[in-house]
Each structure stands twice: as structure tokens, then as C-alpha cells.
Curated annotation (Swiss-Prot):
Monomer. Binds 1 zinc ion per subunit. It catalyses: tRNA(Met) + L-methionine + ATP = L-methionyl-tRNA(Met) + AMP + diphosphate. Its cofactor is Zn(2+). Is required not only for elongation of protein synthesis but also for the initiation of all mRNA translation through initiator tRNA(fMet) aminoacylation. Zn(2+) binds at residues 141, 144, 153, 156. PANTHER family: METHIONINE--TRNA LIGASE, METHIONINE--TRNA LIGASE, CYTOPLASMIC. CDD domains: Anticodon_Ia_Met, MetRS_core. This is Methionine--tRNA ligase. HAMAP family: Met_tRNA_synth_type1 (MF_00098).
């Protein structure tokens, strides 16, 4: 089976925060799992280097947009690598390859009659002497009356036109823009109304889209899909490949989602492999992002794919809700966020991954709390998982000189592990990552209970053979926990694999155990709870 996984493209205008990672982490879990299953996986993403936010940041700092994009793209790559993300291709939207692919898609849509020209009114700033792209216009949402950008309201998820906003202001200078006529290209989105309606009905029946994606898309379909501009007067981006319109750029909402397609083509060129199997209609596809990106993946991208004749529209939409910080809405402008480069300097990446999975905003907003983060590490990763691994392997090191005791796998334990693989695998495929991880940790707690009840420290003297059986089965459990947890906690799983000399990485019960155990090190270190106050002081002290 061919598995295509697309992770949303973060804007390269500032550092990643935990909200980004909470929404993107499911993609890596899926990729690792399906590779272990032996499936053909293509997992792609990249940095959005063409968006208006980059141009705004560059103007604020007095540097070029390219400098801003380079800085944060490199930082993103480093952060994703340090968090264990296993992208097959992580690229950027200002690459020559991406520009060519997007222009080809634009021309195909134009040739098929899905794009047309239209004279429209657009916000124009007399002070800045330029037409204002949607994100350059800010004001009040006409639907919910909250603060909003010209392209979308984060409060109610409404897709907006800048002219819809109340109390419009230029983001660059704060003046009120005038309205002037200009010519733009439009995408005939309304012609895909019935196909999008069918897609969301199928997703509702099969449960392959998150509830928020189903509800929001049903709302758009009920209201009627409206044609959308596909060109804008932007300072950076992909030029319109039509004579006389080269100064205009392809609008980011259609350009950025086409990044999945361009990254796939780039991967094929770089590896010499064929990517057509990921777009032939038979592939299982997963699109992973936050709920603010739902319309681009449930409406826009399917329509583009239908328009260019590609058979695979999003089968699974994994759209997480929002992550708050200490019960407050995350705000990058106010510096109310936990920044990824910062937290990675001081904490184990598996601790970050664990917390963001068990507290994932899969169906509702969830909160990141420093207290909960540190206590979950100490109680679950160290106290449950690390404790079971350490007490077992240290026992072998101390009483058997590192030589693996002889034994046979307990039938009940074997059956329990086989059922666990099946249950966890099904949960991952259904994008129920929290359920999957909690199931494994239920088994970890069972393993600790098994160790306590068997009392190998007493068995060693009273019944040495039984003691060997106990420890042998504990190592069997550890080997399988490492394998089951690899999609979630890859770093600690790798440490266990090295200690146990495990070579097999397939998604199946591990029955081959080592002959000896070497160099037993603690799987996790305790975090001093005094760090809670230190982190809170740092967080509150940085608020703007």
C-alpha cells in the first residue's frame, strides 16, 4: 500500500512554538508506524517562505524577505530533526522547483477553464502606495466581531475577503485603506460544490476526517462555495505565468497547498523514484495540520486536485484543535508561547513528544502547563516506563553479570502483546494517537505490577528457575514496548534497542531476545520540580 502524509507548512517568519508541534506530530507517528508495517511511505512538508507574514517581518527588521526565510527555514529543519521528525522531503516554497510546479498547476487549471480573469475592488494604501494583500489588511470580523485578518478569522474560522472587514486598517502603517479597481485571476470553486459535498459525506460516514473538519466543511458547502482570487499584488511569491501579469503573484492559499505536490515531485527527482503511486487514487493519504488550516485541505486542495485531474483527494484529514499555554490563548505577538528551540535546549525530545500526544488537542482545545509537563515526565516516563526498564536490566546486570537468564515466553503475556500490537495499530490508522499511547502505558503499568507480584528479588533465593523466567519475560515486555513506542518515543526506543541489540524494526511482536545486556543506563532522568517555578517566571517575564 502507498501512504502519502503531508504536514502543514509553517510560515518562516518566526520560531516554531508547541502549538505547531502539537498539530504536526501526528504526521511523524503515522510515517514511522507505516514504515514499520512495510508500507511504501512518502512524508513531506516544508517551510512557507512566500507568505505575507515573511514580508511583514522583513520590513519590520529592515532586512530582505529572503534573509528572514533562510533564518527560520534552517531553524525549522534543526528543530524538526531534534524532535525526531522523519520527513522524506522537507523543502521550501521559494525554491525554483516549487515555483515551476505551482506555475504548471496554475496553467493546467487555466487550460481546463477553472481559472478566469475578473476586475475587482481591492484595498489600496495611499500611504504605502500599494495594493494590500489580504494579510496586510486587519480589522473586525463581520460575522463574530472579533479582531481578524483580511483572509480569515481565527475566532470563528470564517474565510474572508479584506473588503468584508469592519474598521479596516493597513497592517504596515495603520492608516485606513481606500478601495480601487484592479484585475485578478479567480478560481471557479463553485463548480466543485457537488464533489466537495460528496467528499465530506463520505468522510462523515467513514470517520476519516476529524469532526471539526467535517462540521466546518459542511458549513461551507451549505453556504455555497464561492470563487476565490488566485492572484494578488504581492512583493514576494510565485509570479503569474501569463504574459502581461508577471508582476502579480499566485495567491498563497493555492500556492502553499500545492507544496505537497511540488515536494512529492522534488522527492521523485532527488531519489530517482516514481511518485505517481501516491497520486493515483489508490493511495491512502493523510493531511496533518491545525484547525485554522481546515478549509485549505478540505475544500481548496481537493478542488485543485480535481481540477488538474489527480485522483487522490484527501482521504484522512487530521486537524487538531488549539493548544493553550497555562490556560491562556497562545499569542506570538505578545510572546505568550513555549518556543521549540528553547524547550529543546533543556528537555528530552521524547518528554515533549509524550506530553503533546497524551494531551493532544485531538477533539478539543487542550493546555500546556509546565507543572503538568514536568509531573507527567517524572510519573509516567521516569516513574512507570523508565522504572520498569531500569529495575529489570539492572537486576540482570547485578545478579546475572549481564548474561540474559534462560526462559520461555509466558503464553498469557504473548497473547497480551499480540493483542496490543493490533489495538495500537488500529488506533494509529484511525488517527487516535492518544488512545494508542495510553494503551501502551496501561501495559507498562501492568508490567510493573507483574514485576512486583513475581518478586524476583525473593524468587532468586527461593526459586532461581522461576526468577529466570520472570526476568526473561520482563525483557520480552521491554523489547516489545520499545517497538510499540517507536512511533511515539523514538529516542528512548533506540536506546533500548541498542542495549538489547534488537535489529528487527517491523511492526510485529519481538520474540528474539539478546544473550547478554551491556551498559545499562537510566532511560530517563528526574526533572527537579523546582524547574516549574523557573519556567513560569521565564514565561511571565517574557510577555510583551
Amino acid at each position: 500500500m502507498s501512504i502519502f502524509i503531508g504536514g502543514a507548512w509553517p510560515y518562516a517568519n518566526g520560531s516554531l512554538h508547541l502549538g505547531h508541534i502539537a498539530s504536526l506530530l501526528p504526521g511523524d507517528i503515522l510515517a514511522r508506524y507505516y514504515r514499520a508495517k512495510g508500507e511504501n511511505v512518502l512524508y513531506v512538508s516544508g517551510s512557507d517562505c512566500n507568505g505575507t507574514p515573511i514580508a511583514i517581518r522583513a520590513k519590520q527588521e529592515g532586512v530582505t524577505a529572503k534573509e528572514i526565510a533562510n533564518k527560520y527555514h534552517e531553524e525549522f529543519e534543526r528543530c524538526f530533526r531534534n524532535l525526531g521528525f522523519t520527513y522524506d522531503c522537507y523543502t521550501r516554497t521559494d525554491s525554483e522547483h516549487h515555483h515551476e510546479t505551482v506555475q504548471n498547476v496554475f496553467l493546467r487549471l487555466l487550460e481546463e477553464g477553472h481559472i478566469y480573469k475578473k476586475t475587482v475592488e481591492q484595498a489600496y494604501c495611499e500611504t504605502c502606495t500599494q495594493f494590500l494583500p489580504d494579510r496586510y489588511v486587519e480589522g473586525v470580523c463581520p460575522h463574530c466581531h472579533e479582531e481578524a485578518r483580511g483572509d480569515q478569522c481565527d475566532a470563528c474560522s470564517a474565510i474572508l475577503d479584506p473588503l468584508d472587514l469592519l474598521e479596516k486598517k493597513c497592517k504596515l502603517c495603520g492608516s485606513t485603506p481606500s478601495i480601487q479597481e484592479t484585475e485578478h485571476f479567480y478560481f471557479a470553486l463553485h463548480t466543485f460544490q457537488e464533489q466537495i459535498k460528496t467528499a465530506v459525506e463520505i468522510a462523515k460516514q467513514t470517520g476519516t476526517w476529524r469532526d471539526n473538519a467535517i462540521q466546518l466543511t459542511e458549513r461551507y458547502v451549505k453556504e455555497g462555495l464561492l470563487d476565490r482570487a488566485v492572484s494578488r499584488d504581492l512583493p514576494i511569491g510565485v509570479p503569474i505565468p501569463v504574459e502581461g501579469y508577471e508582476d502579480k503573484k499566485i495567491y498563497v492559499w493555492i500556492e502553499a497547498v500545492t507544496g505537497y505536490y511540488s515536494a512529492s515531485k522534488h522527492w521523485a527527482e532527488e531519489t530517482g523514484k516514481d511518485d505517481r503511486e501516491f497520486w493515483d487514487g489508490e493511495a491512502k493519504t493523510y493531511y496533518v495540520h491545525g484547525k485554522d488550516n481546515i478549509p485549505f485541505h478540505s475544500v481548496i486542495w481537493p478542488a485543485v486536485l480535481l481540477g488538474i485531474g489527480e485522483g487522490t483527494i484527501p482521504r484522512h484529514i487530521v486537524s487538531n484543535e488549539y493548544l493553550t499555554v497555562e490556560k491562556r490563548k497562545l499569542s506570538t505577538s505578545k510572546n505568550w508561547a513555549v518556543w521549540v528551540p528553547d524547550i529543546l535546549e533543556r528537555y528530552d525530545p521524547d518528554s515533549i513528544r509524550y506530553f503533546l500526544i497524551v494531551n493532544a488537542p485531538e477533539n478539543r482545545d487542550t493546555d500546556f502547563s509546565w507543572r503538568e509537563f514536568i509531573y507527567s515526565h517524572n510519573s509516567e516516563l521516569l516513574g512507570a516506563y523508565g522504572n520498569f526498564v531500569n529495575r529489570t536490566l539492572k537486576f540482570i546486570e547485578k545478579y546475572y553479570g549481564g548474561i540474559m537468564p534462560k526462559g520461555s515466553i509466558d503464553v498469557e503475556l504473548k497473547d497480551k502483546i499480540e493483542r496490543l500490537y493490533k489495538h495500537v495499530g488500529e488506533a494509529i490508522e484511525q488517527t487516535k494517537f492518544k488512545v494508542a499511547l495510553e494503551s501502551i502505558f496501561d501495559a507498562v503499568r501492568f508490567a510493573n505490577k507483574y514485576f512486583d507480584e513475581r518478586q524476583p528479588w525473593k524468587e532468586r533465593e527461593d526459586d532461581p528457575v522461576s526468577c529466570e523466567e520472570t526476568i526473561y519475560n520482563c525483557v520480552y515486555l521491554i523489547a516489545n514496548f520499545a517497538n510499540l513506542l517507536e512511533p511515539f518515543l523514538p529516542f528512548s526506543s533506540e536506546r533500548i534497542r541498542n542495549t538489547l541489540s534488537i535489529v528487527n524494526r517491523n511492526w510485529e511482536p519481538q520474540h528474539t531476545l539478546p544473550s547478554r545486556i551491556d551498559s545499562v543506563q537510566p532511560l530517563f532522568e528526574r526533572i527537579d520540580v523546582k524547574q516549574i517555578e523557573c519556567e513560569l517566571e521565564k514565561l511571565y517575564g517574557a510577555v510583551k
